[in-house]
């Protein structure tokens, strides 16, 4: 039978602005963005957004007051999208924006419900950055990047958007040979670094808060960003899958490459067996097991796993009281596209 889950440390949420002062509700920490605009963004997405989201918008307004969303296009090839489209008023131009599902807006093929795109880059690789939350009622735990045309891997890039863009910029700076371009990047880097320092945002790729989260990760999952679920002192909350990641990948490969439907059905047997284990796990409140299997099958990407992922994931999210994530995965699986991700496109 399957084993118990990994131990979990106490949950610790760090302040959003890491300044050496009491940060309970420091006004200096709050970006100058109108309250009604904040409400509009958060009501469309039904997700809380961290203060760095708004501060970065103000920073981009400083670079280009007319087109803040495109202020990094010429220099870095980056564009602010997703919830930033609401700050830019783009949703007001679209006639039927009221009926749009914003949680599918810029949701790329491999983006799990935990991931919310805020910046896009090279369209050839579908590079994008997004906030990653473990639960829809919590603030993001880090900013991740993914290249959807390549794979499902989510790379952790700091715990705020300033850090993620800084890391991207530093990489770009190493690749640039043109002096003029290099000079432009250095100027932006100076402004970005100064703004982050003034606001108290860490520019580290892996902050203390992110390392604290690592201790709570029960399993890495195929996307590599890790899975965090509540596990009590008796180890209830998660149990391991009976297959390693490598063997699960092999099983998935055998299913996808099966020469006939009969062979495919046969190759599905280990997955069916794991689904039975998940039912036992759910009965005993180890909800993390079904979530892990569902996410792994979703991240594998083949349409052959959409039905199974559609059975496992909404149930797991609802059992974990992450109901919005259940809604997102159902909508995404029903409209999973490799290209049409801009919901506001005409």
Swiss-Prot record:
Residues 1-10 have a biased composition (Basic residues). It is found in: Chromosome; Nucleus. InterPro entries: HPF1. The modification PolyADP-ribosyl glutamic acid is found at residue 240. GO terms for molecular function: chromatin binding; histone binding; poly-ADP-D-ribose binding; protein ADP-ribosyltransferase-substrate adaptor activity. The active site is at 284 (proton donor). The modification ADP-ribosyltyrosine is found at residue 238. The modification N6-acetyllysine is found at residues 19, 186, 233. The modification PolyADP-ribosyl aspartic acid is found at residue 235. Residues 1-29 are annotated as: Disordered. Residues 242-346 are annotated as: Interaction with PARP1. The keyword Nucleus applies. The modification ADP-ribosylserine is found at residue 97. Cofactor for serine ADP-ribosylation that confers serine specificity on PARP1 and PARP2 and plays a key role in DNA damage response. Initiates the repair of double-strand DNA breaks: recruited to DNA damage sites by PARP1 and PARP2 and switches the amino acid specificity of PARP1 and PARP2 from aspartate or glutamate to serine residues, licensing serine ADP-ribosylation of target proteins. Serine ADP-ribosylation of target proteins, such as histones, promotes decompaction of chromatin and the recruitment of repair factors leading to the reparation of DNA strand breaks. Interacts with PARP1 (via the PARP catalytic domain). Interacts with PARP2 (via the PARP catalytic domain). Interacts with core nucleosomes in a PARP1- and PARP2-dependent manner. Belongs to the HPF1 family. This is Histone PARylation factor 1. It comes from Bos taurus (Bovine).
């Amino acid at each position: 039978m399957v084993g118990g889950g990994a131990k979990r440390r106490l949950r610790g949420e760090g302040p959003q602005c890491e300044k050496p002062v009491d940060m309970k509700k420091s006004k200096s920490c709050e970006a100058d963005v109108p309250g009604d605009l904040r409400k509009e963004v958060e009501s469309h997405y039904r997700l809380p957004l961290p203060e760095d989201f708004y501060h970065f918008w103000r920073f981009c307004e400083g670079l280009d007051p007319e087109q803040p969303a495109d202020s990094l296009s010429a220099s870095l090839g980056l564009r602010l999208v997703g919830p930033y489209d609401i700050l830019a008023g783009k949703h007001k131009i679209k006639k039927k924006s009221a009926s749009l599902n914003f949680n599918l807006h810029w949701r790329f093929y491999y983006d799990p419900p935990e991931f919310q795109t805020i910046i896009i880059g090279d369209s050839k690789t579908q590079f994008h950055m997004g906030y990653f939350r473990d639960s829809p009622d919590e603030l993001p735990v880090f900013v991740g990047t993914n290249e959807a045309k390549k794979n499902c891997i989510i790379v952790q890039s700091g715990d705020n958007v300033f850090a993620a863009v800084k890391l991207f910029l530093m990489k770009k700076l190493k690749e640039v040979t043109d002096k003029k371009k290099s000079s432009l990047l250095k100027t932006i880097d100076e402004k970005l670094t100064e703004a982050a320092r003034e606001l108290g945002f860490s520019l580290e790729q892996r902050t203390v808060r992110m390392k604290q989260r690592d201790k709570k990760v029960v399993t890495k999952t195929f996307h590599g960003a890790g899975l965090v679920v509540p596990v009590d002192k008796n180890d209830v909350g998660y149990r391991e899958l009976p297959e390693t990641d490598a063997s699960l990948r092999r099983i998935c490969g055998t299913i996808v490459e099966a020469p006939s439907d009969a062979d495919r059905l046969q190759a599905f047997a280990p997955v069916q067996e794991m689904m039975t284990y998940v039912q036992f796990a759910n009965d005993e409140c180890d909800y993390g097991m079904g979530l892990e299997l569902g996410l792994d099958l979703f991240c594998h990407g083949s349409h052959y796993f959409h039905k199974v992922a559609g059975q496992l994931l909404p149930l797991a999210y609802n059992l974990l009281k992450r109901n919005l994530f259940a809604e997102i995965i159902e909508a995404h699986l029903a409209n999973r596209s490799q290209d049409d991700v801009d919901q506001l496109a005409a």
